Each structure stands twice: as structure tokens, then as C-alpha cells.
């Protein structure tokens, strides 16, 4: 919407205009025609191979060489570059610039197009935190997949804990369930921590898994002073020294994000399980870029690549974020989820976008004619964290303090006695100290 109407209009309109307005021709007959009398709600498969499917949303990621004025001492994305060359890849059209992570996420997970919502709206905040909705999680669960979401930042940001529950995930592991030891100079968790938790998600079930990972390392703001003492990659070409410092910081975060991507692929290769991994950037970084700065001359493009170990044909094309889930599922012979089925069947047909708006309205704001009284999800069932947090022992120390022993504690763990929060000190993942609590 911002690219259509501009910032001033969208900002003011976002205060009053949310949701999808009812289309003029919205009625039961129209929806039944669009969905072939509800056939699009069915789940079918025409392929015996059901791999693990991992989506990795890389915070503020794009290929820095797309910024034409920037010179770097070496390629900041050698692992992803190799993937670009050998696997399906291209530009990834996203709904926002410099911010709006949750909106790209929304399009990827639901297949819905943000264009039909209010300008500047976040459906996570306005709709999905209070209403269940089918998504990639429910689509994959229809085939028996375990479904997991991961994020190395706070679980309540963008109401993710509520949203992921409402769209059908089995589990959500946020930073509150991670022992994060490494952070950027700006204080964001480094992405390498996600490897352990992706492995835990895959190990938590006997069947195939859909794992949706949201990274945070590349997050702004980007420091305008030099904060990395000995950067792996040096940068020149930005218009000012301050901008150059910001770009150098960003490029070095991207380099480490690329190392994370390479390590994830290596981990999946070593597991030996059939697997597809999709990497993509959620939006461009907040660097004040203009269209003329970019090779693509477009500010809503990031990059994506689809790595696999099952022999998928390389097929390069540019794709909007709301279509990628349907594309990946189609390549695997999986047809599930009303909106994803719609994309697979109708993308090249007349009135594709017009009918998509009608379908989105019916599912989120209308009478849900598409489900004929049988929606694919009626309530959430999600648990926070993959591994159970347990308390196994309470020990009184000689100084009349107490030590709690258990498993999977983190620095975010809180201790309550009779519903009263206690002062506590996290020592490690098996021990927490209570310096001032009275238990007698």
C-alpha cells in the first residue's frame, strides 16, 4: 500500500482503516464458484516423497552487491551465493521496506496478499491475535507433519505467541526458551543459536516436520560510528563516513547470517533426511535506500533461494512472498490449505487477484462460506518451547538461601511462590538461586 499511495496517506489511513472491505460481489454463490464448491479446502498429495520443510526468514537480508555503489573487501554471502547458483532462486517481492517483518511473515504463512488490507496494517496485531486462521502450519499438519516456529527474540513481539497458536503451530520457541550467549554490538541475538533449536524441533517428532524460523541478527538500527574493531569485511562507497560505518556493520552481520545458513545446510546434509530449506529476506535494511541505488531499481525486492537434497529442478524466477509457500508445496506434490490450493490452481487465470481478495475476505471477515461450517482450525493447541522445563530439587544452603535444580532453565526463567514473583539469579540451564525467599 505504501508504494501505491505514499507515506502521509498511509500513515493517516492506518489509524482508521483496517481489515478488508467487503467486495461488492461477495456472496455464497461467488465463493462456491471460486473454490469449486469447497474442493479447494481439501488436502491431497500426488508424490510419495514428504521431506522436512524449513523456512528461514532472515532479518533485513538482501544480497549487499545489489546496492550498486557499495564495494566490499570480499563476498559477504559465499554460502548463499553458491546456493543461488545451484538451486531455485530470484528476487523476493515483499510488502514493506525497512520494517514490517511481521507482514512478510504473514504473507508467507497464510498466502494472503497484504494489498487488500488497510494501509500500514499489521494483521498479526489487528486480526490474527484474536482469531484462528488456517496457515502453512495447518496445511502441513494435514499430512501428519510436526509444525514448529522459532524466533531468537521476544515471543510477544508482534503478538507472535498468540498468532502462532491461532494459526495452528504445535510449538513456538522464542528467546525466553533459549540460552543466548552471543549478541551483536547492537544487542541482538546472533542467529547461530537457532541451529540447536532447529535440531531440537526436528528431533522432537518421529515424522516429518515443518519448521518456520524467524531470525533477528540483521536487525537495525545500524550504528553510524565504527563499532566492530576488526571487521571480517571492510566496506567503501557509501556517501558519508557515518553511512559507511552503518553499511560495514550491516554487511558483517550478513556475513555471519550467511555462515548460519551454510551451517544449517551442512547440518541437514549430515542428518541425511529428505529436506527442503527456503531462505529469504523479509525486507531491505533501514538504510535510506532509493530505487535508483538498486540493481533491480525496486525497493520491495529482497532475495530468496530454495535448497534441497531431493533433486528438485532449478527454476529461477521472481516471486511475491504470498506465493512462495504454495510454490514449494506444489513442487513437492502437496496440495493443502485453501489459499495455497487457490494459488496453485488459479495463478495464471482471469480474475486471479480479484477472486483472491474475495477469498481472503470470506476467510477472515466474512461468513466463511468456503468452509461450509467445517473450518480446518477451531482452536490453538500450541506449547511454548520444545523441551519441557522441569524442577527436580530444592536445596537449602548454609546461608539460608535456596538453590533450584532442574532442566532447561534460561535467564528469562521466573520463580513464583504462592503466586508472588521472587528475586532470583540464573546460574545455568540446571540451576537458579533464590537469595531472599522464605519458605518456612
Predicted region positions:
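Transmembrane and membrane-interface helices of multi-pass
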Residues: 1-3, 439
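Alpha-helix initiation and N-capping motif
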Residues: 4-9, 23-28, 77, 102-105, ...
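Helix-hairpin-helix/helix-loop-helix acidic hairpins
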Residues: 6-48
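Solvent-exposed soluble domains appended to multi-pass membrane proteins
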Residues: 38-50, 58, 63-433, 440
Amino acid at each position: 500500500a505504501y508504494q501505491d499511495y505514499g507515506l502521509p496517506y498511509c500513515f493517516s489511513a492506518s489509524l482508521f482503516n483496517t481489515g478488508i472491505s467487503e467486495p461488492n460481489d461477495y456472496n455464497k454463490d461467488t465463493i462456491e464458484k471460486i473454490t469449486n464448491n469447497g474442493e479447494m479446502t481439501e488436502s491431497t498429495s500426488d508424490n510419495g516423497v514428504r521431506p522436512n520443510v524449513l523456512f528461514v526468514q532472515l532479518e533485513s537480508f538482501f544480497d549487499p552487491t545489489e546496492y550498486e555503489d557499495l564495494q566490499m573487501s570480499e563476498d559477504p554471502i559465499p554460502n548463499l551465493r553458491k546456493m543461488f547458483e545451484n538451486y531455485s532462486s530470484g528476487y523476493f517481492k515483499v510488502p514493506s521496506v525497512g520494517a514490517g517483518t511481521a507482514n512478510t511473515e504473514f504473507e508467507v504463512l497464510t498466502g494472503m496478499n497484504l494489498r487488500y488490507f488497510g494501509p500500514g496494517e499489521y494483521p498479526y496485531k489487528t486480526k490474527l491475535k484474536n482469531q484462528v486462521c488456517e496457515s502453512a502450519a495447518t496445511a502441513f499438519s494435514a499430512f501428519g507433519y510436526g509444525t514448529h516456529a522459532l524466533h531468537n527474540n521476544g515471543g510477544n513481539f508482534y503478538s507472535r505467541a498468540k498468532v502462532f497458536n491461532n494459526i495452528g503451530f504445535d510449538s513456538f520457541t522464542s528467546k525466553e526458551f533459549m540460552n543466548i550467549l552471543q549478541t551483536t554490538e547492537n544487542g541482538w541475538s546472533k542467529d547461530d543459536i537457532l541451529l540447536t533449536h532447529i535440531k531440537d524441533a526436528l528431533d522432537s517428532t518421529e515424522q516429518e516436520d515443518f519448521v518456520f524460523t524467524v531470525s533477528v541478527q540483521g536487525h537495525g538500527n545500524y550504528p553510524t560510528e565504527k563499532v566492530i574493531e576488526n571487521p571480517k569485511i571492510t566496506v567503501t562507497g557509501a556517501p558519508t563516513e557515518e553511512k559507511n560505518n552503518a553499511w560495514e556493520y550491516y554487511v558483517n552481520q550478513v556475513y555471519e547470517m550467511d555462515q548460519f545458513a551454510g551451517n544449517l545446510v551442512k547440518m541437514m546434509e549430515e542428518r541425511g533426511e529428505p529436506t527442503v530449506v527456503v531462505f529469504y529476506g523479509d525486507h531491505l535494511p533501514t538504510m535510506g535506500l532509493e530505487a535508483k541505488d538498486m540493481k533491480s531499481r525496486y525497493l520491495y525486492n529482497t532475495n530468496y533461494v530454495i535448497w534441497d537434497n531431493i533433486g528438485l529442478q532449478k527454476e529461477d524466477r521472481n516471486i511475491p512472498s504470498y506465493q512462495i509457500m504454495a510454490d514449494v508445496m506444489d513442487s513437492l506434490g502437496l496440495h493443502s490449505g485453501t489459499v495455497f490450493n487457490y494459488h496453485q490452481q488459479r495463478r495464471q487465470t482471469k480474475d486471479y487477484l480479484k477472486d483472491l481478495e474475495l477469498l481472503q475476505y470470506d476467510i477472515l471477515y466474512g461468513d466463511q462460506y468456503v468452509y461450509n461450517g467445517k473450518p480446518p482450525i477451531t482452536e490453538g493447541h500450541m506449547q511454548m518451547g520444545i523441551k519441557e522445563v522441569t524442577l527436580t530439587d530444592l536445596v537449602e544452603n548454609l546461608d539460608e538461601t535456596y538453590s533450584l535444580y532442574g532442566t532447561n532453565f534460561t535467564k528469562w526463567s521466573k520463580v513464583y511462590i504462592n503466586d508472588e514473583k521472587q528475586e532470583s539469579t540464573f546460574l545455568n540451564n540446571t540451576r537458579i538461586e533464590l537469595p531472599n525467599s522464605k519458605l518456612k
